[in-house]
Amino acid sequence: MLKHQLLLPEGILILEPDAPLEAADFEGLVSEIDPYIAEHGKLSGLMVHAKAFPGWANLEAFRAHMQFIKSHHQKIVRLSLVTDSTLLGELPKIAAHLVHVQVKHFSESQHEDALRWLKEGTPVSP
């Protein structure tokens, strides 16, 4: 399951995966953020807040996740990954080579710093 919250007017999306991801998680996510992106052009930021990566429920969920990344990574200014997981903490180094977005890792204790960093990103103009 992927909990999500779109902070308005900042245009910051917060994602909190807490169970294996389903294809429906991404369908719900897209239906909420695509209208915002259509109106504003981009999201100012995306925060992934996770204790650990829960994986995918099945191959369909994996495909939906990859399609979401492919179709949205150029529409996000900054990505913060908030976690104490060693494995997830390494993802920004990998992601920097694959996506066109500023990526930064923050520990759990730096949650507010991560949010502040996202808010400092290029403001989205209507």
State where each predicted segment sits.
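Amphipathic, Lys/Arg-enriched alpha-helical "gate/interface" segment within cytosolic domains
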Residues: 1-126
